[in-house]
Amino acid sequence: MRKFFDYFKGLSKSSRALSVPPTSDVDGPLDFEMIVEEIEHAAKKMKYGKACGYDNYCNEMILALVKTYPKVLLKLFNDILRSSEVIPGWALGMIVPIYKDGPKLDAANYRGITLISCLGKLFLSVLNNRLIAFSIENNLLSPSQLGFVSKNRCSDAHIIIHNLVKQKCHKEGSKIFSCFVDFKKAFDSVPRDLLLTKLSNMGITGKFFNILRHIYTTDKAGIKMGPSCSDFFNLDIGVRQGCILSPLLFNLFLCDLAKHFDAMEEKVKLGNIGINSLFWADDLVLFAETKEGLDKLLKILEDYCKENHLLINTKKTKCMIFNKTGRLMRRPFYLDGVKLEMVRRYKYLGFVITPSGEICTGLKDLRDRALKAFMKIKNDLGPSFNQDIPIILKLLDSLVKPIILYASDFWGCLKLPKNNPVENLHMLMCKQILGVQKQTTNAGVLLEIGRIPLSICAAKFSLKNWERIRLGVGNKILLEVFKEGDESWDQSIKSLLESNGMLNFYVDDPALEYPFVFKKLYQRLYDNFHETTFGAINEISSKLRTYALFKTEPGLEKYLTDVKNVSIRQHVTKFRLSNHRLAIETGRHDGTAPEARYCPFCPNEIEDEAHFLFKCSTLRHLRLRYLEPIKRGIRGFDFFPNSFKLKALMSDVEYDTCKFIADGTELRNFLISKPRPVG
């Protein structure tokens, strides 16, 4: 514990003398008494099962108190507000070291998670809501500050960059000079005295300010390992970890830099707006139309960081020149005297972008990350991986799907590459879950397992995002530029609607009931997929000509849930999807004419699925054992044409049918592989 104590204490110590502003003696605009509704509104965001702070009050206890005796909390909170000092335990945090990687005996290979008072969090949540309203009313934040702002999304930044690149580079043939800035431990290095001074200068005064001042000047933390906690040490630097106010306070600390950039002439013009910076918390990207413009922006940033005691990681700060061809262009850019690296790709807010703005590289990165997650599930489950398909599909949807569909509210409506990496991985996972070969027809796999293409899910997220933007919800810059240009993100939405026969919904109508309309849009996407897919398997040349006889409704097949024996189930799946070794299929690969694909045991008989089920003499004893009882339950079964028999037997596969297919397949394969006597 001593190693962790010394390490985290060292991180929390300021290297400079602090000059904390004095307490405020005037009544501030945020000092009005709390009401019950404020507490109840803040309590709605509290979740069960969260760890307690030093005072051991858990969320369950607090929520019960809010529900039964809210006025008790109201009196407590108002007393604290009037006194301008929080309860001492609320300024105490317990740091839990979480291992990252590297040698486990090195404390530097751990990150700290700070547990603070849950009751204190509720009080500060009320203050946070007040501060949000105050910052909006007084325009404290710049429109370029997207992060930690209500209803903004990471996709907002991606859409803005997409439209910039498409219009300026692809349409106009210009270049955009950009720099992706990496602040070094930005949240942990904010000087607290400068933060408080800036807040005071913004008009955040009175008791509200004094409470923030009291928390930040008495803040302490100890190291928690198991049930034990070390002595407490002072925290002199950075916004408080785990505090709900911290994201907004960090934004307010940087807002003077953002507004400085806003006032500059060096901007990339798009429509009626100019853009030279986008902030997402501590992720900053700078834009300019010329090299000299970006040099100026970098100089402003360098001076600001020196003045505000922030550090930039120049090794991780990269420059990129957006251009139509996507080639790597090199120009010298410097920050703090260090030459910055020019890159061809950069992972910005979790999605890889390139100089041309193409999305295939980003999709491949998502595919690779999702594949790792899928393989981990597969390796962890071992032999039981295929045991319960519904559970595996739930794991796929909860652990892998969110990774592969990350940022799809941005890219889901864009023109996807023909060899879509996301869809390729989805098909690979579905085929491994079913236990069929890679060559199995994709349409049949999706229908059998009851899945839809992930591209439809991605399109749905994009449409939902479009609904939000159309209703005027989102960042001010985004609302200005999302329609700009012939190849804008909005035009991609229009193309998506047109390709699905829904162009009539592309309207600006305030009276339009968007939730109802979008419900219809989503249903149309699903219907179009199923219509197209069922049409594909019904084609005469389709490999799934037999499958089309009995697969008439979408959804997970019942036998995939009911049959627990993996070997039997996989034999049935392969048989249904024509992923078997009957002559009707193997003849495709060795060039045998369809009319000459004979059964190896029955002279002059075409060996297809119907022959295997109803006629092959080699399987007669198995047929009597497994299929005869089923046939007797279907009146006139023997007089049906083969297409009717297949539909009757395979539409809802009974266990005995599964056993026949599995045992029959294994017997057939054994007899074929057995050496035959010569002569």
Language-model features, listed with the residues they occupy:
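Active-site-proximal segment of RNA-dependent polymerases
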Residues: 12-41, 85, 91-94, 133-189, ...
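Short, conserved micro-motifs composed of acidic
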Residues: 29, 227, 311-344
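Conserved catalytic palm subdomain of right-hand nucleotidyl-transferase polymerases, strongest
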Residues: 48-57, 105-115, 156-200, 611
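Extended C-terminal regions of large enzymes
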Residues: 399, 421-426, 437-583, 679
